Amino acid sequence: AGNLNLQRLFVLTGSTTASASELIINSLRSYLDVRVIGKQTFGKTVGMRSTMNLKNRLDTSPVTFHIYNKDREADYEDGFHPDVAIDEFKSDLAEFGDLKDPLLGQAITR
């Protein structure tokens, strides 16, 4: 087990942010201050396991588990609402790592 040695984490999101990204937000918010910057996430609180039957050409992905954090919280079916709402596509895009990027700029200045 390790320690991130952080007090606060900023997560940059878009409307298609889901699944593993939301799992990270939900899991870490039990341990530190997690701030969401961007758009509301998708809201996927479950996981699936895909199986393929080649003989019948059938692929199924049933829901096999519900994701909770250590506090038994899984209350993001409607997604995580951003602490700072930004539509990154309403302004000019910048190079990766450039502080002119609206999401990164907000995270760095907080």
PLM features: what roles do these ranges have?
Residues 1-110:
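C-terminal "post-core" interaction segments
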